[in-house]
Amino acid sequence: MRSIFIVPIFLLFLSSCSEEKTQNKNQEEKQIIVQETLQNNNTSQEINQEAVNSENAAESIVPANDNNQTDEVSTPPSQEQKNPEIKPVKVTFKVDDNDMVLGNKKSNVIVVEYFSPTCPHCAYYHQTIFPELKKKYIDTNKIAYVVREFIATKQDLDAAILARCKGDINSFVQFHNIILQQQDKWAYSNKYRELLTDIGQLGGVPPEEYKQCLNSDKITETLIANTNFVANAPKFIGTPSFFVNGVQTGNYSIDSISTAVDKALEEQKEKAKNEMSL
């Protein structure tokens, strides 16, 4: 099933990451040291905080509404699909059941990040820019921050499946962080699947469970739908890309994203004030 979409999707993966991937493919294969990362960073502490934010977010820091976005894309059911329980995945710029969400799920200011596991710019963003954004808007429950995948390569697909394998936000954040931190050690290796399997096992996903997830229609169709949806956005040129209530930001700098978020927060406050005065 995957082979029918990887090639056309790959053509959409443009300037943001192409040069870096070409250069890195020629690097000498490195040995991955995942255990050291798991022991020496404070990922688990951040995971717990993010999970608490997602599950126990304040209900009305910014009042929720149902009128944020209207565009949606539905992926057609596969002709080869045999499982009648798998339904076409519908994607919008709102929060849905398939999304991995940090912060306040009920906020009506929704920031959607599109990233690729093999994208060097995405790794840079998460290591240098995201922590400040998280502290300012996510930890304070001001926004719903949705992390979605753009699948450009087979490596992207397999890494994204590993991150979603357990299905909960804690596990997703753990693997999301490690996959990006260790990107140069697995993404361009001929043994990338073996290295991802090692990452999974050290993070609590045994090889057999990872194999089952790789064969999961539900996970794969979610990733396909996420990718196809953003690929149809008029201004989408690559990853990372950000949308605030459906409007794409200029770039992935802290200033650009903060300006867009602050504007959306102010608009929602004014809207709430006007509704109360009626």
Swiss-Prot record:
Annotated GO MF terms: disulfide oxidoreductase activity
Disordered: annotated span: 62-84
Enzyme class: oxidoreductase
All copies of domain Thioredoxin, residue ranges: 77-266
Transmembrane region(s): none
Gene Ontology CC entries for this record: periplasmic space
Sequence ranges of Polar residues compositional bias: 65-81
Keyword terms of this UniProt record: Disulfide bond, Oxidoreductase, Periplasm, Redox-active center, Signal
Main location (coarse class): periplasm
Family annotation (Pfam families): Thioredoxin_4 (PF13462)
UniProt cross-references to InterPro entries, sorted A to Z: Thioredoxin-like_fold, Thioredoxin-like_sf, Thioredoxin_CS, Thioredoxin_domain
EC number: 1.8.-.-
Disulfide bonds: 119-122
Leader peptide range in chain numbering: 1-18
Compartmental location: Periplasm
Annotated family: Belongs to the thioredoxin family. DsbA subfamily.
General function of this protein: May be required for disulfide bond formation in some proteins.
Protein name: Putative protein-disulfide oxidoreductase RF_0032
